[in-house]
Structure formats: C-alpha cells, structure tokens
Regions:
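Residue-level recognition of single "structural anchor" positions
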Residues: 1-271
Length: 271
C-alpha cells in the first residue's frame, strides 16, 4: 500500500523541538539570529556599534551612535511579555503543528497557564500567521471552490442565501507535481461577479490557471488576468474530481477543526 507523501512528510517532533528550544537561552539566541542574522543593527540608525545593558534574555542593546535602546522582543508579538520565551515558543509550536486546530482551552492545559493568557497567546500567534501570509498571491495552478460556514436555524433559509451562513472562498495553489503549496480562506460579501473579481485581484497572480466548478461568478477571475477553467461537476463524487482534490481536502480539514477544536464560532470574528 502506497503512503501519502503529504500526510507522512517529516515534521518537527516534540523531542526535536525541546532539544532546539527547550531553554530561555536557546529561544533568545533563535530570536537574535532571526532578527539580526548578520549581527546587531540599530532599528533607528542601522549602526552596528553597540553595547549590552543588563544580562540574560531581558538584556537591552544600546546603540553607541544614537543611544537608542532595544530588546530582542521589541516590535514583535512578544514585546513587553512577562511570560518565559519557552512558553511562547512552545505555544507557537503547538498551534502551528496542530493539523486539526487547537483551541485556547486546549492550549491552556498544554502550557499550564491561565485561560486569559492562553487566549491572548492564541489570538496573537494566529493573527501573526495570517498577517504574514495575507500579501502572498496564489499562482501557477489554483483549485477554487465556494463554501459556507454556519449551522441550522429553525424557520430560516437553507443553503445559499441563509442568514445563518457566512460565504467564503477556498483556494489552494498546487505546483507542477500536483502538490499543494498555499491556501486562501477568505470571507466574501457573496458569490457575485463583483465580489469574486475583487477577491481575485487581491489573492491571485496574473496568468494563474484557475480550476473551479460551474458557478457563474467564478468567471470573474479573468478580471485579475487569470485563465478560468470551469468544470460542471453535477452529481460527481469528490473521488471523481482530481482537479478539486486539495481544495476538498482543505474544506474537510476545516470542518474537522471547527467541530473538534472549537465546536462553534462567532461569525462576526470572520469579517
């Protein structure tokens, strides 16, 4: 039986993580290497001439040129933190490695911190990851689908147009070997040509080949200079649609995450 190489790709195990980031000194050195890979540079005047004030991971770096002081975590999501760096690094590891998501409550139990602290860590880390990825445009080949988040409401509409459903676009870029590379999950005002055109211009690189079902509004990706390749799926099963394999996988994982980690969510947070 052949193994799925994507599912079984090598990650960082907990022992590997602890060997690399198990102490405050290791975490501080990792931040320093990421922030100043070629040595200290003053964030104000770019001078490398400096001296160190204090000691340990809370030490300050003072520029000899402009006298500006900065710390390892200044300007980062860890700025002004009173938590150990090891707690931050472990939180980042747990959240980024959880395939089916990790709730703030589960993070609290894993880290041994209060729920408000775990919630704040959860919010900051997820927001930082989203901000980092937001400017990236999908390219080459993209699988595109429409989806809704929401539950049942007695007496309300069902399906598209339901007042209890939030429409969003799911898109996955794949490389020349058919392997998934990047995903986009974005809330849209609705599945109209105007909304999809606006989304495509922000999230798709010109020249991208876009595979979608026959939903008419998806033809608006052409406004972003993309090649639209629609396919009317009808009653076909997901296994019969290799062109949508990865976007269907992403949507399946999303539903598993919401059901298993969060159970429910406030849709105002998606806007």
């Amino acid at each position: 039986m052949a193994f799925n190489q994507i599912q079984f790709q090598h990650g960082m195990s907990i022992p590997e993580f602890l060997r690399s980031f198990g102490t405050e000194a290791q975490c501080a050195e990792a931040i320093k290497a990421a922030r100043w890979p070629e040595g200290f540079r003053c964030p104000r005047c770019s001078s490398s001439d400096h001296y160190v004030v204090g000691h340990g991971v809370r030490k300050l770096f003072q520029c000899n040129g402009c006298r500006h002081q900065t710390s390892l975590t200044a300007g980062s999501l860890m700025a002004h933190t009173k938590l150990p760096l090891t707690t931050w690094f472990l939180a980042i590891y747990l959240i980024s490695q959880a395939k089916t998501g990790l709730s703030a409550l589960a993070l609290k139990r894993q880290l041994g911190v209060s729920y408000p602290t775990a919630w704040l860590l959860h919010q900051k880390i997820n927001r930082a990851m989203a901000t980092q990825d937001a400017p990236h445009q999908l390219s080459v080949t993209v699988q595109l689908d429409d989806a809704y988040l929401g539950g049942e409401r007695t007496g309300g509409k069902v399906g598209r147009g339901s007042e209890n459903k939030v429409p969003f676009v799911a898109a996955v870029s794949v490389n020349d070997h058919g392997h998934p590379m990047f995903i986009k999950l974005n809330v849209v005002r609705g599945f109209t040509s105007e909304a999809i055109s606006k989304w495509a211009k922000s999230n798709l690189a010109p020249g991208t080949s876009v595979h979608s079902d026959g939903l008419a509004c998806f033809s608006a990706v052409a406004d972003a200079g993309c090649l639209h390749l629609p396919m009317v799926v009808g009653s076909l099963k997901p296994r019969d649609l290799p062109s949508f394999k990865w976007v269907n996988t992403v949507l399946g994982n999303l539903k598993t995450t919401l059901a298993g980690a969060f159970h429910a969510l406030n849709y105002r947070k998606l806007g």
